[in-house]
C-alpha cells in the first residue's frame, strides 16, 4: 500500500536549490562547460548515450553536467527527453563492414584482411596516476597521417566462408521496437539486443564475468572488436532511394563461442554480439558474452547460470527502472510500517502470555 503525501513545497524548492549549489561547486573556479564534458569525458558521454538511447553527444554531456556526473541520473534525464521526440524516420540497417575504423583487434587471428589497428586504448597503460595532469593537463601534439584503409571484412565472415560458423541471414522480419511495445519473455533476438544495449554496464559486466567462472556454458574468444564511424542512411518517401544523413561512432564486438554439434548439421562455432554507441568497448564485450549466454535454449543447452535466464537478465538490466524501484523506498511508508509494527507487538504479547 502506497500513501500519497504532499511534501512542503518550500522545503522541496530549497532542496533543489541546495542541490544546484552543490552541483556548481566552488564558484571561484571556472564552470565546466558542456563542450568540455563532451570532449574530455567522452567515455562517460558514450555510456550515457548508449543507455539513454539517444546518439547525441551534446545532450549526453548536458545530462552529465545537470546530474553532477551521476551516470544513472544522466541516463534518466536523456530517457525522459527521448519520450518528447517525434519519430521522423527509420534508418537503413547499419553496414558495420564498411566502418571507417578507429580501432580493430582480433584475439583469434593475428593476420586478418584489413589488418589490426590498435587505436586509442587504456589496455597497455600501467594504471599509475599521472600527476602531470595536476600541473598543466597538457598533452603532447599528435602526429597524424592521411587515413588509408583496406577492405576489412568481419572475422566471422571468414569463419563462415570456411564452414566453421553459421552465416547471419536477414529474415526480412521487422525488428521489435522496445520503446513502443513493452518486451515480453520469451523475447525475439532484436528485442533482446535492444534491452542489452540499454542495460546497465556494471550489471552486464558482472553477468559476463559469471559466465567465465562456470555459471553457464560459455567458452569465448574475442573474434573481433571494431570501433569507428558508420554511415547512417534513410530512404525518404519522396525520393525512394537511400540518402546518407550522417555517421555514428560505434563499437561492435563479435565473440567466437564454443562450438555446437547439431544432429542435422555440421559442428560449428556460435557467436555473441554486442553493439554500442561511442568507444564503450567493455560494454560491447559484456553485451556479447551475455547475448550468447541467453541463446542457451536455442542450442538445447542446460540453463545452469543466472546469465542464461532470459527473464532474470532482461527484467533487471535497466538501471533507470532499477534505480526508480530502489529509490521509491525513500517515500513515506508510514501506514505500511505501522501495520507491521502493530502485528509485531501483537505477536510479542501473545508470546509473553504463552510464557
Task: Describe the function of each predicted region.
Residues 143-355:
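Acidic, serine/proline-rich low-complexity intrinsically disordered regions
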Residues 1-227, 241, 349-355:
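Short, amphipathic alpha-helical interaction segments embedded in low-complexity terminal/linker regions
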